[in-house]
Design a protein with these regions (language model features):
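Residues at alpha-helix caps and immediate loop-helix transition turns in enzyme cores, especially N-
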Residues: 24, 114-115
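A short glycine-rich, Lys/Arg-flanked "PGG" loop and its adjoining helix->strand segment in the class I
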Residues: 116-128
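Conserved catalytic-core motifs of eukaryotic protein kinase domains, centered on the activation segment
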Residues: 111-113, 145
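Short amphipathic alpha-helix with an adjacent loop that forms part of the alpha/beta core around
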Residues: 90-94
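Short catalytic micro-motifs in class I SAM-dependent methyltransferases
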Residues: 104-108
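A conserved beta-strand element that flanks and buttresses the S-adenosyl-L-methionine
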Residues: 101
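Class I (Rossmann-like) S-adenosyl-L-methionine-dependent methyltransferase catalytic domain
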Residues: 1-36, 41-89, 133-213
Length: 213
């Protein structure tokens, strides 16, 4: 059985989870202007868009499929344009966006086809030469993760998938998988890094900024 989104889980933690794959503004700053249209897919409660707002950007739109996350964001940051979306679709015209943010979103989508569907939608909304800035989690080789990867592989058929005790089903990625997902973008930044997870562990990660081909 494949789980491609877990709306109930993310709605349930909307008021308690703090996300940890943070914006590195210095990496993206050389490529954007104050008038840039910036879209955050999987925006949660809008924390990253608010950082851009504080730096003087105003054309900011966020999408998330968890309605409680959007509701929480509208209360915290009422000046942001936050919307609920479904099925990897964004109510945005084609070729209209300068920058799409995708922060720790692919980790929440365990199905290859659904991941690619989202990347195709991002390609659609980006202007020619527009940018994607994504960060996400890569495979780890410590015993705790290796055990849960094996359990997840037996249950879901994809190595790197695992369950959290509180109900989330997540995925850590092989670097080759990330290259496949980003093949339609010209790399501007492609870095390996370490991220803290929502539950306080450390994980291998990737930061990728690419230009639409």
């Amino acid at each position: 059985m494949q789980f491609t989104s877990q709306t109930d889980y993310w709605n349930s933690v909307a008021k308690s989870k703090e996300f940890t794959t943070n914006l590195n503004y210095g990496l993206i700053a050389p490529f954007i202007k104050p008038e840039s249209n910036i879209l955050d897919y999987g925006c949660g409660y809008g924390r990253t868009l608010n950082e851009f707002h504080e730096k003087g950007f105003h054309y900011l739109t966020g999408f998330d499929y968890a309605a409680e996350m959007i509701s929480s964001g509208k209360k915290r940051f009422p000046f942001l344009n936050l919307k609920v979306c479904q099925d990897n679709k964004m109510d945005i015209p084609s070729d209209s966006t300068d920058l799409v943010l995708l922060f720790a979103v692919l980790t929440c989508i365990i199905d290859n086809e659904k991941q690619q569907e989202l990347m195709n939608e991002i390609q659609r909304v980006l202007k020619p030469g527009g940018l994607i800035y994504l960060n996400d989690f890569l495979l780890n080789n410590d015993e705790r993760n290796l055990v849960r990867y094996e359990i997840g592989f037996e249950k879901y058929g994809t190595y790197g998938v695992f369950e959290l005790t509180e109900g989330a089903i997540l995925r850590h990625h092989d670097p080759l998988r990330m290259k496949e997902l980003t093949k339609n973008f010209i790399p501007v930044v492609d870095e390996k890094t370490l991220f803290q997870t929502m539950n306080g562990h450390t994980s291998n990660g990737i930061i990728f900024i690419g230009r639409k081909r």
